[in-house]
Amino acid sequence: MSELLTKKISAFIITKNEAARIERAINSVKNIADEVIVVDSESTDKTVIIAESLGAKVVVKPWLGYVGQKSFAETICKNDWILNIDADEELSKELQDEIEYIFASQNQDRYLAYQIKLLIMHRNDTRPRIFAPYNKCTRLYNKKFASFANTINSTTHDSVVFNKDVDFANKIYTLNEAAYHYSGTSIEQLVAKANFYSGEQAKDLIKQGKKPSNIRIATEMIWWFFKAFFIRRYFVFGFDGFVDSMIFAFARFLRLAKLRELSLQCNPATRSQDLKTQFVIQDPVDKPRDDNIV
């Protein structure tokens, strides 16, 4: 950690089989953090070995969901100020310098939390593209006032939420410099993540009593491809952006398809009514239904 920082920062990263990316993530935070904690979900690759070799404190924790893992990580951070990045992210050198300047000048407590711009980096790129899409997320915050644990009814939508008794008006500052979010290591990895994440989302939605219409399921991919490729500007990545947008749209479709499946399993009595609205062409003569077609 830089000796210029007057208040110390705890950085944490949650991982599962991130041997290919964890070094980049840790190296981008270790110069501004007093401690780097890796909460690992029983990786079977060299994630733990690499993290420990870089000086990180590794705690193995069976998977609790995205919110659960990050909430647990907060509890073992010794400092009030917490910096969270994911294993597929990296703080730019400029952002590291900006954070160091704020803390070295003792101005960090003017705000309760800081938002970071996460520039999307395609896995084949070495630097950000012009007009690359980005997301703004609260990733640097004082845990006395905010926490991932305040997220309600979700194990997947991991966001820092302020305590109910905290007035956070004008207390969040968006940092000028950016971090980089890498889109994935391969198409195979993106598809595997889409399959896993959509299942977790479906479980969250069924707990909330959600049930999608068949029309919504049928049109979900069309809308989300349009949103990813055009509105979120994945077109800047060329044909690679087209491929990733298709995978993203498919993930959104899977989320609703799995939700429908769970809904039918939870309430079998609705199945006969649901079948009446499905887009299945029936033969005029009754025949045994092929469930693989449904």
UniProtKB/Swiss-Prot annotation:
Pfam families, A to Z: Glycos_transf_2
PANTHER family named in the record: GLYCOSYLTRANSFERASE, POLY-BETA-1,6-N-ACETYL-D-GLUCOSAMINE SYNTHASE
SUPFAM superfamilies found in the cross-reference section: Nucleotide-diphospho-sugar transferases
Family (UniProt): Belongs to the glycosyltransferase 2 family. WaaE/KdtX subfamily.
EC number per UniProt: 2.4.-.-
Keyword list, A-Z: Glycosyltransferase, Transferase
One GO MF term attached to the UniProt entry: glycosyltransferase activity
Record protein name field: Uncharacterized glycosyltransferase RBE_0523
Name of the top EC class for this enzyme: transferase
